[in-house]
């Protein structure tokens, strides 16, 4: 993968000199795959495609050691600091982000939250806002496909993904801060349509 000289120099500054006053955030993605096909980067594991409740794309972290827990091979992504970045904290997820996703998902099924759900269902749906983002949406798909509501599970998963993907498409990156993991590591999603292959590179030799 050929990079512009200025971009290559920036990567070298980060890796070899640990400089932080540049125009990019350096993000890390680790995998056990010896060959990483960026054309199919939204297929995060071999075999059948699986549910991505936080949206399709490639996930990174600014915490290299945390990233390495997911695989032996580490890749870099340079995210320009001028990018349009959506930052989600546990507080903002609980107070607004989850409710927005829930509203749009229910609308897809023509469910009126106030008229078409029981008191118990209302309590369950809103309780999920207090979980971590990935847990909230995993439990939402289980609730919608439960016998009480009875929607088809694969369809529910596709619906949640499509809603989240549409929200994420407005941004170059979605940055989850303090929403999960005991190490307080962040997680950054580069959405499918925002991913720039020229900024994705295998780790350079030390």
Spans of features found by a protein language model:
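Active-site and NAD+-binding cores of ADP-ribose-processing enzymes
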Residues: 1-54, 64, 71-206
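GIY-YIG-like beta-to-alpha core
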Residues: 58-66
